[in-house]
Each structure stands twice: as structure tokens, then as C-alpha cells.
């Protein structure tokens, strides 16, 4: 099979024709759809009906934003060393991480504070990025109607929040992320049901999750290895240098290249927009965000989310004949 980047449909508005896929709403893995289509065919042709995936590896064994509080409770001196490492390797202000480590807010208190910042359009405290939930930053290309809708929904949840999934931010985020990946696994089974393939992701197994949650937060960090906890569990089953730290992959570079090739056509294709017709986005601002996203990866994610939602709405309209 060709490299994943050559299949990408990140900025492609070609309609989705699979009814099971449309039932799932705008799927998070839409950009990999063409690759997965070919992968399913290749697996079926090989005579196999079982495919293992690595879903959950990053969530279980890598750094999560809520890690700093757990590190501090485990060992303050060790936490300071890891905070210093994160400050230099991820370019995060040390004072921000330290405030997050010392902050003892409950899940509900965090939701209430984030909700208030959204309502007042004030900038959330930077340390909230490393607490229970990240600050909700409504994109500038949302319309007033769309903004009000998001604030209303979030405020309702903040006023009567469900119980957190975990006892601390790290457990909450780990369980939440694994739950999301489990949802992706279910979607694959639904969308590719006709292939007869049993899609499996062993790292999303409940016993694996429980084992990781029982481990120390510091076990996720090592000066030389990525995912040291997983490396220790795998032991000699993997080559000795398999988990050595490597430079950042080229996935983001691929997305930038794809956007550069598609942005002019995409801008034109969005001259009419199902999202804009719903009134939840500012049409001109949305097109500008797609054509000229911010220079950060987040800007590209914004553009990707716009395309994913727009593609889904157009596909639903095409299949149902409704506007």
C-alpha cells in the first residue's frame, strides 16, 4: 500500500456515500478514510479476517496534560525535574506547569471556571490547559448564534456536571481518551462490516487500562525512551532500540503540503456552505480561516474540522435530498 499521506482527504469535500459512516456523524478519522478503504480491501484479499491496531498507545503511555498534578503528588522534587524537561522539550512555561501542579480544583470547579471564561469572553488561565479539561476556546469564525449555542450547552453541563471518569486529571483524561478510541474501533466495525474484518485494539482493553492507571505517573517519562512504561511491559519482545526517542514525524508536514495544494480550490468550493446555511459560522471568516489558517498546527486543525463538518452536512443533504 502507498504511504498514508498519499491517501489523505483532509481538505477534500468529496461526498461520503456510506450510510453507516454518515450515521456516525462527522467522523474524526475522515482524513484517513481512503487509506482505510484500501486497507480493508487488502486485508480481505489476503484471506485474513482479523486486524490489530495500536489505538490507545499514546493515551496510555505518553504525556497527558493532566500529568503534572499526579507527578507533584507522587514526588515534588521529581516533578520539578520533569516540569523542567517539559518546559524545554515542549516549550511550555515552567510557571504555568507549576501552577497546574499545585492547583487542587475539583472537576466541577474547573468546569465552572472554564464556563465563566467563555461567557465573559475572557482569556482562560494558561494552567487550565493542564488540569481536568482544557479551556474551551470558541473559534473566531463562529457566528454569534453558534457561539451562544456552545456556551449554553457547556454552561448547562458545568452547572450539573456528571461525575468525573477518574479521581484526578490524569486518570480522567486517560479514561476519556481510551473511551474515544474505543468509539473509533466500534465505528470501523460498523463502517467496514461488509468486509467481515474483526478490528481489534488490545491497548483499549479494560485490564490494560486498569494496569496503567495503577502505575506511577513518572513511569511515563524517560530521558532516552518514548513510552518507557510500554517498553518495560514489552521487554525483550521488541528490539532494544525500538522505543528510543526519535524526531517528530512528518505527519504535520504532510498536512501542510496538502493544504497548500488544496486551499485555493477549497476556498472556491466553500463559496456556498451548509455550515453557513445553519447560521452557526460567519461565512466570510470561515472561508478565510480555511484559506489562511494560523501558522500553528491548531490553525490547520480548525481548517480540517471545518472541512469534516461541511463534508458530512453536504453528504447528508445529498443522500436524503433535504436541505
Spans of model-derived segments:
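ATP-dependent adenylate-handling active sites, centered on carboxylate activation for C-N bond formation
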Residues: 1-149, 190-237, 312-323
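Long, Lys/Arg- and hydrophobic-enriched amphipathic alpha-helices
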Residues: 22-36, 169, 193, 283-289, ...
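Short, hydrophobic/amphipathic alpha-helical patches that form generic packing surfaces
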Residues: 38, 175-186, 190, 301-318
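PAPS-dependent sulfotransferase catalytic core
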Residues: 65, 238-297
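Glycine/proline-rich, flexible active-site/cofactor-binding loop segments
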Residues: 132-173
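Structural motif
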Residues: 163-176, 223-225, 289-306, 316-317
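Secondary-structure capping and boundary motifs in well-ordered enzyme cores
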Residues: 177-180, 200-204, 258, 299
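Short coil/turn segments at secondary-structure boundaries
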Residues: 190, 194-196, 224-227, 244-249, ...
